[in-house]
Amino acid sequence: VDALAAARAIAELKVQPRPVSLAYEASPVMDIILGAAKEGASLYAVTDPAGITHRVWEVKREDAVGAIRAMLDQAPEPVLADDPAYAGALVGASQLLADEARSAGTYTGKEPFNFTVAVLFPAAQVSGGAPQVPTGLLTHQVARF
């Protein structure tokens, strides 16, 4: 797939089809924090065609969000665990949409296309390939609003 064509297709959607997968170096403290976040009911539980169930939890408590941020600040930078072409297409789509907004005189820098939704996985979970949230789940949820 041509990189520019992929970027144009995403820009036309005006929504990110799926999160970018990133891998981080796990730590026992992070495992405890995330384990506590997963004690409640998940927001989504989607089973893909391969029979794998993907669950998504929302972390709302300010102290938990702060603890996760603090742990990520101390850890090495997450690395891309996704298809580099997909990540590049997202960057390209963002640039196309930014250029369009600048031409229209409406660019503020706070548009949704300036941000990317990412999913963090412990590096040990991605050694055989990055797990991915099913394509379309994010698009569907954004389209609801």
Give residue ranges: language-model regions.
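Surface-exposed, charge/polar-rich loops and edge strands
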Residues: V1-F145
